Amino acid sequence: MKLHFVKNLADRREIMMNYHLLARGIRDPAVLKAMLEVPREAFVAEGMEELAYDDYALPIDEGQTISQPYIVAYMAESLELSAADRVLEIGTGSGYAAAVLSRIVSTVYTVERLAGLARSAHQRLEMLSYGNIHVLEGDGTLGWPEYAPYDAIVVTAGAPDLPKPLLSQLSVGGRLVIPVGATPYLQMLVRVRRVSEEEYRSEELCPVRFVPLIGAAGW
């Protein structure tokens, strides 16, 4: 795999920070720092590097997309992360969001159902020296039970309902951020807190549009 970088992207990165993140309410210093540190141009399709810091989703391999910078930052901030947290991500894609999370928390576990994406994301993250990210090819709706429980779980695809396997893999006090909706392409971003072994509390954050979450506990 060859990684592609574009010189003189610093100005665009600053525009992203000032106009797409700060101006829209992102305030968590750790999230902002991570968004500045991670080179989004290394995670987009070849030939689209100059668009890396524009605030919209871009196509990647396998007919999938890399989320716009604002939604990556918003979801990370909504997880209410601390440096010692262990995070599970469902939907690795090119690995960009996992890379951002890895600059904030101790360890990231990420699951991708598409073999080609899982393989290329693993290679990319390894080449970029993100040593605290672990990639698994598999059905993300089932989580990654081997390393559960997690302090936070983030899902980057829209589910018809809250996947029970993911709820069960949250630690008490843990947060799940996930798009949920009755149609595959229009959802409400929801944050769920596990307040005890048996009790969960959820709140709606904002309307979003994600690709469908495919799997045994998804579409």
From Swiss-Prot:
SUPFAM superfamilies (UniProt xref): S-adenosyl-L-methionine-dependent methyltransferases
Alphabetical keyword list: Cytoplasm, Methyltransferase, S-adenosyl-L-methionine, Transferase
CDD domains: AdoMet_MTases
Keyword Transferase: yes
CC terms in the record's Gene Ontology section: cytoplasm
Subcellular location per the Swiss-Prot or TrEMBL entry: Cytoplasm
GO function terms (MF aspect): protein-L-isoaspartate (D-aspartate) O-methyltransferase activity
Catalytic activity: [protein]-L-isoaspartate + S-adenosyl-L-methionine = [protein]-L-isoaspartate alpha-methyl ester + S-adenosyl-L-homocysteine
Active site location: S67
Domain of life: Bacteria
EC number: 2.1.1.77
Gene3D superfamilies attached to this UniProt entry: Vaccinia Virus protein VP39
Alphabetized NCBIfam families for the sequence: pimt (TIGR00080), PRK00312.1 (NF001453)
PANTHER family, per the entry: PROTEIN-L-ISOASPARTATE O-METHYLTRANSFERASE, PROTEIN-L-ISOASPARTATE(D-ASPARTATE) O-METHYLTRANSFERASE
UniProt record similarity statement: Belongs to the methyltransferase superfamily. L-isoaspartyl/D-aspartyl protein methyltransferase family.
Role of this protein: Catalyzes the methyl esterification of L-isoaspartyl residues in peptides and proteins that result from spontaneous decomposition of normal L-aspartyl and L-asparaginyl residues. It plays a role in the repair and/or degradation of damaged proteins.
Name the UniProt record assigns to this protein: Protein-L-isoaspartate O-methyltransferase 1
Originating species: Geotalea uraniireducens (strain Rf4)
Native organism taxonomy: Bacteria, Pseudomonadati, Thermodesulfobacteriota, Desulfuromonadia, Geobacterales
